[in-house]
C-alpha cells in the first residue's frame, strides 16, 4: 500500500473483551439478529442497544411477520449471563436488570428501496463506504499487533470462565505496540497494555505477575518477538474493580476499529453488529475482506485494501478502488477489472456467496469479525484463479 513506514517505526492496535460494555451491546444486538433469522431468513433487522448501570434499552427496527415469536428481553438476559455478569458487584447482574424493548418497524420507504416490486434483486439497504483489508503479517492475514491484542483477551476470558483465575471479572481491554522494519515486517513487541477488571482483594503485584506469566507469555508463540526491552502496562490506572456498565455506558457499534483491522486499514464508519445482510455496511465489508485476503494469499501484494461504495436502493456498487502498493497503473487496472468481472458485489450476490442468511452473527462480534476461519469470507478458494490470471 502507499504507506511510508520508517525503519523501526511502531504501530499499535487495541482489542476489547466480550465483557466490555460496548461489546455487551454488540452481542445482544447480534443475538437478536440470529434469533430473528432462525424464524425468518428474510427478516430485516437493525438492532441497537444501550446499556448503562443495570439498565438495557433495545431499540432499532425489525421487519418480519414473525417478529413477536422471539423474546427480546430474555435474549438480552441470557447474553449477559453467558458473559459472566452474574453479580451486581461485577457491574451488571442478569437476574436484576431492567430491559426496555423499544424496537419498532422498518420504514416502508427503506423496504421499497431494498425490495423492488416484481424483481428478485435487492438494492443496497443504505449508502455507505466500505473497506476490506488483508496483510501477510500472520497466517490469518491480519495485522500482528491486532491479532495478538485479541488473542491475549481470549486467553484471559478462557481462564476466567474455566475458574483457573477466579479473581478475573468480565470487563477488559488490551493494546499491543509492535516495531516494524523498513520492509513493513513486524520484528518485535515494544509494549503490551492489559487493563482487566478484578476482585477488590487482589494485589497489584499478583495481578501483574499472573497476567504476564499466565496470560500474555503463553499466548505469544513466537518468543523471538519478546525481549528484555518489551514493557508491560498491567492495569496502569491502578484498581479496576468498578467495571462493566456501572463503570462505563455501552453502545452497539462503538468499537468499529477493534471489530475490523485495528487501525491498519481505513474505515467508512458503518458498524457491523445488529444489521442483517441487506445492510452493506456489514455484508460488503465481509465480501471486501474475502477479496483482499485471497489477493494477499495469492501473492499479489503484501497488503491489500479494497474500497466499495453503495447508494441506497442501487444494486451494484457505485465505485470500487484498490490500494495495494502497486506502481504499475496497467497492472492495477487489470486487478480492478478482475474484481469487477469475477465477484458479484450486489447484495444478493454477496448474501448467496457468503451464506449470510444463516444465524451466525453472534459468533462474529467478539474478538474481531475477521480471522475466524469458520466463516465463508475467510476461505481461500479464489487463490488459484487469481494466480492464474493475475500473478506476474
UniProtKB/Swiss-Prot annotation:
Pathway the protein acts in: Amino-acid biosynthesis; S-adenosyl-L-methionine biosynthesis; S-adenosyl-L-methionine from L-methionine: step 1/1
Binding sites annotated in the UniProt record for L-methionine: 61, 106, 248, 279
Compartment(s) of residence: Cytoplasm
GO cellular component terms listed in the entry, alphabetical order: cytoplasm
CDD domains: S-AdoMet_synt (cd18079)
GO terms of molecular function: ATP binding; magnesium ion binding; methionine adenosyltransferase activity
Assembly with partners or alone: Homotetramer; dimer of dimers.
Protein name: S-adenosylmethionine synthase
Naturally occurring in which organism (per UniProt): Borreliella afzelii (strain PKo)
Amino acid at each position: 500500500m502507499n504507506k511510508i513506514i520508517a525503519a523501526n517505526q511502531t504501530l499499535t492496535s487495541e482489542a476489547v473483551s466480550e465483557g466490555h460494555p460496548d461489546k455487551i451491546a454488540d452481542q445482544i444486538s447480534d443475538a437478536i439478529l440470529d434469533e430473528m433469522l432462525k424464524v425468518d431468513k428474510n427478516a430485516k433487522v437493525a438492532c441497537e442497544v444501550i446499556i448503562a448501570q443495570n439498565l438495557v434499552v433495545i431499540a432499532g427496527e425489525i421487519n418480519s411477520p414473525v417478529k413477536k415469536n422471539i423474546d427480546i428481553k430474555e435474549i438480552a438476559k441470557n447474553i449477559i449471563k453467558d458473559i459472566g455478569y452474574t453479580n451486581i458487584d461485577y457491574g451488571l447482574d442478569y437476574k436484576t436488570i431492567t430491559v426496555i424493548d423499544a424496537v419498532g418497524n422498518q420504514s416502508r420507504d427503506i423496504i421499497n428501496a431494498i425490495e423492488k416490486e416484481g424483481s428478485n434483486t435487492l438494492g443496497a439497504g443504505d449508502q455507505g463506504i466500505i473497506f476490506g483489508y488483508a496483510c501477510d503479517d500472520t497466517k490469518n492475514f491480519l495485522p500482528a499487533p491486532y491479532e495478538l491484542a485479541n488473542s491475549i483477551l481470549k486467553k484471559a476470558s478462557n481462564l476466567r470462565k474455566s475458574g483457573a483465575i477466579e479473581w478475573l471479572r468480565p470487563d477488559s481491554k488490551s493494546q499491543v505496540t509492535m516495531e516494524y522494519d523498513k520492509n513493513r515486517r513486524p520484528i518485535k513487541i515494544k509494549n503490551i497494555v492489559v487493563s482487566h477488571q478484578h476482585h477488590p482483594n487482589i494485589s497489584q503485584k499478583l495481578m501483574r505477575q499472573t497476567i504476564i506469566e499466565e496470560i500474555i507469555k503463553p499466548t505469544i508463540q513466537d518468543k523471538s518477538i519478546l525481549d528484555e526491552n518489551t514493557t508491560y502496562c498491567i492495569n496502569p490506572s491502578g484498581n479496576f474493580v468498578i467495571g462493566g456498565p456501572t463503570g462505563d455506558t455501552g453502545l452497539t457499534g462503538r468499537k468499529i476499529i477493534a471489530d475490523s483491522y485495528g487501525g491498519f486499514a481505513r474505515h467508512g464508519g458503518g458498524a457491523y453488529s445488529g444489521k442483517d445482510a441487506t445492510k452493506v455496511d456489514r455484508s460488503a465489508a465481509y465480501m471486501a475482506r474475502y477479496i483482499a485476503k485471497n489477493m494477499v494469499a495469492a501473492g499479489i501484494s503484501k497488503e491489500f485494501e479494497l474500497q466499495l461504495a453503495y447508494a441506497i436502493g442501487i444494486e451494484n456498487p457505485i465505485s470500487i478502488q484498490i490500494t495495494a502498493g502497486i506502481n504499475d497503473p496497467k497492472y492495477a487496472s487489470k486487478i480492478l477489472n478482475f474484481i469487477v468481472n469475477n465477484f458479484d458485489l450486489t447484495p444478493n450476490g454477496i448474501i448467496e456467496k457468503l451464506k449470510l442468511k444463516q444465524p451466525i452473527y453472534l459468533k462474529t462480534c467478539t474478538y474481531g469479525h475477521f480471522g475466524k476461519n469458520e466463516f465463508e469470507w475467510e476461505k481461500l478458494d479464489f487463490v488459484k484463479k487469481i494466480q492464474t490470471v493475475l500473478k506476474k
